[in-house]
């Protein structure tokens, strides 16, 4: 083979889209589509049509640029097999490693608390409205559900991981089917409520405030950051040796872009379908009831007057069951990450990193007691889920997803080539706006 033929062959090989790229595209997409998506329509539809249209414009840039920034940070380490913790330690020393360990733990643990509240409220709503039984004691319901999940985790972890992987695509398909199924029930209420003469940009219910608060729920819902480190390591091992780091970065960006487009298409279609079926007033009521949008839809169809069609009855029960399955799936997935993070913190600070001083079984037991105990307390207290997301969950995710990569770009020599770009400003602004939600909630 001539030199020119070899170059053409190499270029063709480089430009080709591999099966593994498709697998990772779907993997990133599937990771993001979880229980958090069930709250996005409530916040997005809370302010009516114009704010959700603005969120539609922002959705893809937020999903793509923020995750690409995190991927670039993961790519910047000298070791192709090094995860994000090792990369941060390489750039900022042991202190940086401790910071990233804390960030990962506190980015995931509040999500468990959110899901603890959500699963309790969703089950109680289903019990009372769809099954028609008398209300149960909240503390008992939360304790029962958490003990049930603890039992499954303790005795069937491997089975749980397999079941979780199988549930991703049925859940995505269910969201799409429900979105399509709601089309016959669409109405013009959200359009009729648009009054250009009375629109306000500022103020408590102004467009800018609504979109600002919506950004935090987008950061929370459009989030596959927990898997980005593993994704980058996999792509570096696959591509970097043959094609170099720049090509690997472009390939990762391409995969993240396609995953983000899929995610935005599914979630925004679901949000618009819910909004056209309900109304901004219904979304406000769902927020006040502290339940996911599928539970509210189930109650909405349950309260329909006149003779209900078989389709409406099926949708009523299916919405609640899908919501419960989605929350269980998300809880299990985040529990594993929280357990790993807490085990690491206990080992690092309680046993000075010496794994020989404590057994894995003891570590898991200590971590489970703390995780389940704290989740039960929060579930019993029943704080507003959207407020919890906006004040705790989303800001911590934003600090990891947006601000840490931007700080690394400013400080790390291996990331110097990414300095001075407009997308860095965008990612930084998104991160700061999300974190500033804490200040807004306080005042």
UniProtKB/Swiss-Prot annotation:
Membrane topology: Multi-pass membrane protein
One GO term describing the cellular component: plasma membrane
Keywords linked to the UniProt accession: Amino-acid transport, Cell inner membrane, Cell membrane, Membrane, Symport, Transmembrane, Transmembrane helix, Transport
UniProt subcellular location: Cell inner membrane
Annotated Pfam families: Trp_Tyr_perm (PF03222)
Highest taxon of the lineage: Bacteria
Single GO MF annotation: symporter activity
Bilayer-spanning residue ranges: 22-42, 44-64, 97-117, 140-160, 163-183, 207-227, 261-281, 311-331, 366-386, 389-409, 423-443
Catalysed reaction, written as an equation: L-threonine(in) + H(+)(in) = L-threonine(out) + H(+)(out); L-serine(in) + H(+)(in) = L-serine(out) + H(+)(out)
InterPro entries on file: Amino_acid_transport_2, Hydroxy_aa_transpt, Thr/Ser_transpt_TdcC
Primary residence: membrane
Function recorded in the entry: Involved in the import of threonine and serine into the cell, with the concomitant import of a proton (symport system).
Family, as annotated: Belongs to the amino acid/polyamine transporter 2 family. SdaC/TdcC subfamily.
Name under which the protein is recorded: Threonine/serine transporter TdcC
Gene from which this protein is expressed: tdcC
């Amino acid at each position: 083979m001539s030199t020119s033929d070899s170059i053409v062959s190499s270029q063709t090989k480089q430009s080709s889209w591999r099966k593994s790229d498709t697998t990772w595209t779907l993997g990133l997409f599937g990771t993001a589509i979880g229980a958090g998506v069930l709250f996005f329509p409530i916040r997005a539809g809370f302010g009516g049509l114009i704010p959700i249209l603005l969120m539609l414009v922002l959705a893809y840039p937020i999903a793509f640029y923020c995750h690409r920034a995190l991927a670039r940070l993961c790519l910047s380490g000298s070791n192709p097999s090094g995860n994000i913790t090792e990369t941060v330690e390489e750039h900022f020393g042991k202190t940086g490693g401790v910071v990233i360990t804390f960030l990962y733990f506190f980015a995931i643990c509040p999500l468990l608390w959110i899901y603890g509240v959500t699963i309790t409220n969703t089950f109680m709503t289903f019990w009372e409205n769809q099954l028609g039984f008398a209300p149960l004691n909240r503390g008992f319901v939360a304790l029962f559900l958490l003990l049930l999940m603890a039992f499954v985790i303790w005795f069937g972890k491997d089975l749980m991981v397999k079941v979780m992987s199988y549930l991703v695509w049925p859940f995505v398909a269910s969201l799409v089917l429900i979105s399509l199924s709601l089309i016959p029930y669409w109405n013009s209420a959200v359009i009729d409520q648009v009054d250009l003469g009375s629109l306000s940009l500022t103020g408590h219910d102004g467009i800018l405030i609504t979109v600002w608060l919506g950004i935090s729920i987008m950061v929370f819902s459009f989030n596959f950051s927990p898997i980005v480190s593993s994704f980058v390591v996999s792509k570096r091992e696959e591509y970097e040796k043959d094609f170099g780091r720049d090509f690997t970065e472009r390939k990762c960006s391409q995969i993240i872009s396609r995953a983000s487009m899929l995610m935005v298409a599914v979630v925004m279609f679901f949000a618009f379908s819910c909004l056209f079926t309900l109304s901004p007033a219904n979304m406000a009521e769902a927020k006040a009831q502290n339940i996911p949008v599928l539970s509210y839809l189930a109650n909405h169809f349950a309260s329909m007057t006149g003779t209900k069609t078989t389709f409406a009855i099926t949708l009523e029960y299916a919405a609640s069951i899908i919501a419960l399955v989605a929350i269980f799936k998300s809880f299990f997935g985040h529990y594993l990450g929280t357990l790993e993070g807490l085990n690491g913190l206990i080992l690092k600070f309680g046993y000075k990193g010496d794994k020989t001083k404590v057994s894995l079984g003891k570590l898991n037991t200590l971590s489970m007691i703390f995780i389940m105990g704290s989740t039960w307390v929060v579930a019993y207290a029943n704080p507003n889920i959207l407020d919890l997301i906006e004040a705790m969950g989303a800001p911590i995710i934003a600090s990891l997803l947006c601000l840490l990569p931007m700080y690394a770009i400013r400080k790390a020599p291996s990331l110097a080539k990414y300095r001075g770009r407009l997308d860095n400003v965008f990612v930084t602004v998104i991160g700061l706006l999300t974190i500033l939600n804490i200040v807004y909630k306080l005042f």
